[in-house]
Amino acid sequence: MDYFLKNLKWLINALALEPKLLHTLLPPHSYIPNEMTDQYEMIVDEDLSDIAPVLTAEQIEHFKPLHNYINSLFVREDLIDCWYDNDFIYSSEWNVIHTMAKDFEQYMGWEISEPLKPLYSEIIYVDSEDE
């Protein structure tokens, strides 16, 4: 499976998970909203050029509402600190992301493979006090 398609599927499946399950995908003490949006920005380029080759034009059209919504949140100054607050995944804004991701997931026929594999396969602590 193509790198971008595989990672897009993981990302959509992750965003479609119930918020309490997002903690299982990332290392302890991670800023979940920030990590998820960093992944989003790496996989889905602003102009959709990275995923355009792996999705049909119709699939892109179904993806655009989610993409536009996420981008609208990125530019909101009142949310600038929310990306570093894990409570944000329980907000109404995140619920819209969750719902739209579930809708796109269903449209694509992607099943959530629970448990979804963690984002990182290994965590290396550089501070000996962390475990």
Positions of the model-derived regions?
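Short terminal alpha-helical segments
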Residues: 1-47
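Proline-rich intrinsically disordered, low-complexity coils
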Residues: 19, 27-28, 33, 53, ...
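Eukaryotic acidic, Ser/Thr-rich intrinsically disordered low-complexity regions
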Residues: 105, 116-126
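Eukaryote-specific, cytoplasm-facing alpha-helical/coiled-coil scaffolding segments in long proteins
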Residues: 37, 124-131
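Generic signature of intrinsically disordered, low-complexity, basic-rich segments
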Residues: 10-12, 97, 124
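Amphipathic protein-protein interaction modules
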Residues: 49-109, 113
